[in-house]
Amino acid sequence: YKGEVIYDKAFGLLMPSREGHRQMVETGSLYDLASITKAAATTPAMMLLVAEKKVRLDAPLLTYLPETRESLLGMVTIRQLLLHESGLPAGINFYTDLIDDSSYEGALIRSKSFAGGVRLVGRAWGNPNFQFKGDFIADQPSKTHTLTFGHRRYLSPSFKQVLLDRLFSARVSSNKSYRYSDLNFLLLQE
């Protein structure tokens, strides 16, 4: 407050290490914020829009995104999106829309190691012989590939519509109990 720390405490335990040890959280503990950005940026923006009466928490999504009118997604409320009670799946593998299926043989991802395969995470092995679709990914920036996607990889802004089309057609469960979903915040950003 006014340049002074007024509360500096730490609680809980960190995730177990590979050796299985759990360490107490300290005030100097570091965290990976990779996935929290969506919530940390979107939630305050939504709070501001609600305070300005530009968004109503209990309004269905179709109020703000008419393209959701024809699906169950249109009936999901802003409140349900914020509380992860939308019925949306945890995520969608959008990367599959970026990869040219004809550029590799066999499966893209397998559950067992195979000759030439690259270990991804856990028991997942990837086929490194794939190519990205040129419509969406390029090795050099250009008028059509303006967004930095990775090291020497540039994404076309046109991919956003592919992402939104997949999102708008996602299956919405009638079970509205808590289930974390990255998709909620992607929708709220729209």
Locate each region found by the language model:
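Active-site-proximal loop and beta-strand segments within enzyme catalytic domains
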Residues: 12-180
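Residue-level detector of high-confidence beta-strand sites
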Residues: 8-10
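Short, glycine-anchored, charge-dense loop/turn motifs used at functional sites
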Residues: 1-6
